[in-house]
Amino acid sequence: MLIRDVRPWGGPASDVVIEGGRISVVRPHDESVPLGAEDVEGRGRLLLPSFSDVHVHLDSTRIGLPFREHTGSPGVWGMMMNDRRNWRDTDVPHAEIVAGTLERMIARGTTRVRSYAQVDVDCKLEKFDAVMAAKERFADQAEVQIMTFPQAGILLEEGTVDYLEESLKQGADVMGGIDPSQLDRDPVKHLDIVFGLAEKYQVEIDIHLHEPGHLGVFSTELVLERVRALGMQGKVTMSHAYELGGVNEATSRRLIDEFAELDIAMASVAPAARNQLSLVDLVSSGVRFGLGEDGQRDYWSPYGNGDLLDRTWQLAFTNNFRRDEHIEMCLAIATMGGASIMSQASPRLTGVQDRPGTAVGDRADLVLVDGETPTSAVMDRGTDRTVLHDGRVVADGLRVLAH
């Protein structure tokens, strides 16, 4: 396949050849080269790696349903109970809602997804099954990892552990944990279960951390100890963790250094939080960092629309970035930053200036988007997009193509 007249990361006009699902040639654009039936006319658009949403709750999405007033009360437990009371209040099959949101994400340029699937004594495996069905339905258009996620805690309701283990038996890719100290109030037992199941089923771990200040640092230190003791370097992600920068500068620096040493990744949803670890320092230190949309128009929040380019703008905005190099870094995070969380084989960001994902040998998961520069694309978030997964066009003009 030839992709003609595109600008990789805003560089010179180029023609890109795809073979075997990877980029095989990047050469100066030659208008005289004819297009074949399977080739793509770039029309001077930007060529970027496709987006990687590594923190999304497909299991709770309401995209496609009538908009409703937000009724959740503050706090993790209050929001979770709001979801529990309401998520079945529709005649639309849950699997169809989940699949519709995933389709919308693919159409807008996301081809790598790590989705939570809530597992507890209320929903049992219903939400997990819905996400699994969507994963299978769009297996040719996107790579989806499913995290079995104890949204209601692990220790608070008897039977939760059994459902978590059953989901791992049925193919969950990642073992989730949440607020070991604040929610379950027994971080040792909580982490015993999380790390024990991950080891038993040979999956990675993602810890959802909303805990504030010193408490969040304490829980994080317990995770660090286990990663070091169990040799799980490169297999753990800390999600949210938006208070870890609020204790003092020395603690922040120590945590960043330990994350880099132990290859612990971080995933953010670009919150308006003041106590986050420095994004520039994390990337400069080699910490894998990814972006996600979190819940999308669900019982937790009315935000989210399936477009990770919008969330890239939010990441830049909430970090008060103005310089092009920092805004482009946000694009690199939203694309290859997340890809490196989902696969150790993906190119990593090596610093603020790094723009991986469009070189010879890279996997041909790509998105063509209109924009004068990568920064302008983040500002304007145009809709003229063509999406490739494994070297095949899977979406064009915000529509997923049939295969």
Which role fits each region the language model picked out?
Residues M1-P34, P374:
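N-terminal metal-binding scaffold of metallo-dependent hydrolase/deaminase domains
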Residues V6, G21, G44, H55, ...:
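Divalent metal-coordination and catalytic microenvironments
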Residues R62-H94, Y201, S219-T237, L255-E258, ...:
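Active-site gating loops and adjacent loop-to-helix segments of metal-dependent hydrolytic enzymes
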Residues G64-Y116, D122-R137, D162-K169:
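Alpha-helical scaffold segments that flank or form the walls of functional sites
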Residues T148-E158, K169-L277, R288, R297:
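Active-site core of metal-dependent hydrolases
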Residues E225-V236, V280-G371:
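His/Asp/Glu-enriched, well-ordered alpha-helical/loop segment
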Residues P347-H403:
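C-terminal cap of metal-dependent C-N hydrolases
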